[in-house]
């Protein structure tokens, strides 16, 4: 099933992320959420808003350069992954992602299509973000 949520601005993105964070309580962890969309579509903004809704108060930055950031929220550990710069399956393996899944509440994965050969866990949900008129 595909559902569309028109998001007019960052506030609407934050509201959707907050709603999604609230729904996590009814689901079995760990959950893997793939965030897809072009550069500037709002993937990191959505991840930041979701982390805020889960109680993260510290800085939330795009993990583009470090590839992976972990946050201990009131709901549990959230792993935010950005695979944009990944070039090979070996780089993905070197991240040791399997070590991060146990005990996690949620994985937020930006650019999952760069996960090379199915080394990423299958998503429980996918969110496709698009800029209207782009």
Regions found by a protein language model. Name each.
Residues 1-20:
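N-terminal pre-Walker A segment at the start of P-loop NTPase domains
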Residues 3-4, 52, 87-134:
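Short phosphate-coordinating micro-motif centered on Lys-Gly-acidic
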Residues 23-30:
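Phosphate-binding P-loop
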Residues 33-35:
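Hydrophobic anchor at the beta1->P-loop junction of P-loop NTPases
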Residues 39:
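The conserved Walker
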Residues 43:
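Conserved lysine of the Walker
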Residues 56-71:
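Short beta-strand-centered segment that lines the nucleotide-binding/catalytic pocket of NTP-utilizing
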């Amino acid at each position: 099933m595909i559902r569309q949520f028109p998001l007019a601005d960052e506030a609407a993105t934050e509201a959707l992320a907050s709603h999604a964070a609230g729904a996590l309580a009814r689901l079995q962890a760990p959950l893997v959420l793939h965030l897809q969309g072009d550069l500037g579509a709002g993937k990191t903004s959505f991840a930041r808003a979701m982390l805020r809704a889960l109680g993260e108060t510290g800085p939330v930055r795009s993990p583009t350069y470090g590839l992976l950031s972990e946050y201990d929220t009131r709901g549990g550990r959230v792993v935010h992954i950005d695979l944009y710069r990944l070039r090979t399956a070996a780089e993905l393996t070197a991240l040791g992602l399997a070590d991060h899944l146990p005990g996690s509440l949620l994985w937020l994965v930006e650019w999952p299509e760069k996960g090379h050969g199915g080394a990423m866990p299958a998503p429980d949900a996918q969110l496709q973000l698009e800029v209207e008129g782009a």
